Regions:
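Acidic, mature catalytic/reactive cores of soluble proteins
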Residues: 1-279
Length: 279
């Protein structure tokens, strides 16, 4: 997506002296786009159930009970009921997402993540790709990416490698934490797709509103580099990253991308959305 965007920009008049770069960027973009197929993960409902059961077994009792009581999609059954066999409309066709990477045997590392934000903002995804991204954001963690304080950047619940649940937890910089700039990029990307996929405007608007509400729930932490969360109180609660003994790194309170939200407010207003326009 980034290469394709670069190619389009290099075709502008001010870059005409760089004659070969636009074609090379677009050629590489096409090659990488075709290489995405091995990264696609598609799980059947029975596989989703089993992998979620395995993941929940790695959590504390308090975490597990909280997640089991949460709904699987809007109006869906509780996660406990789904694991016991109840049908969840949001998962009737299973669950698809892009793998985090490929392993040494070129097999997908089945960790769900939020990097589709780049595709939404810079790429030309088809309807199916946009719907796949929306589905991940419509589903609460650990089924999807969304928490009450923003989308996590990685969800290891579906990985067959038991190390990932441990190494990509709430204390890991690249784990089940919320990155402010990634969430902002997803919002900007969906605002763009709102124009390109008019038949999906209703779903996109609901996800955009949810993204905004969740970031507001993070309060002052929403302007920091990243934050983690807890559910021990019986609800989602944003927590500063790097403060706990289990944290593997620390967070810088304010970085350049912390200033991205005024631009997003402008885009919201341009789109005529009746969502909260202030943070």
């Amino acid at each position: 997506a980034a290469l394709a965007s670069m190619g389009r920009q290099l075709e502008w008049a001010q870059f005409r002296a760089m004659r070969s770069e636009p074609e090379e960027s677009l050629r590489l973009a096409s090659a990488w786009k075709n290489s995405c197929r091995p990264f696609q993960v598609q799980l059947k409902p029975v596989q989703v159930r089993q992998r979620l059961k395995n993941y929940l077994a790695t959590l504390t009792d308090g975490e597990r009970q909280f997640y089991l009581a949460r709904p699987v999609g809007s109006g869906g059954p509780s996660l406990q009921a789904f694991l016991d066999g109840a049908a969840a409309p949001a998962l009737q066709d299973g669950l698809g997402f892009h793998a985090l990477s490929l392993d040494a045997q070129a097999k997908p590392v089945e960790v769900m993540h939020s990097d589709d934000s780049f595709l939404m903002f810079l790429g030309q995804p088809d309807r199916a790709q946009v719907e796949q991204t929306l589905r991940m954001l419509e589903l609460e963690f650990p089924v999807g990416l969304m928490t009450g304080v923003g989308p996590v950047v990685a969800n290891p619940a579906y990985s067959l490698d038991e190390r990932h649940a441990r190494e990509l937890g709430r204390g890991a910089y690249h784990g089940t934490v919320v990155w402010g700039w990634q969430s902002a990029l997803m919002t900007a990307g969906l605002l763009r797709q709102r124009e390109l996929q008019p038949e999906l405007v209703g779903r996109i608007d609901k996800v955009l509103l949810r993204l905004w509400e969740c970031e507001r729930n993070a309060r002052t932490l929403a302007n920091s580099e990243l934050w983690t969360f807890s559910v021990e109180s019986g609800d989602w609660s944003a927590q500063a990253f790097g403060q706990g003994t289990a944290s593997t790194d620390e967070s810088n309170p304010v970085q350049l991308w912390s200033c991205v939200y005024p631009a997003l407010v402008y885009r919201w207003q341009q789109a005529g959305l009746a969502f909260p326009a202030t943070r």
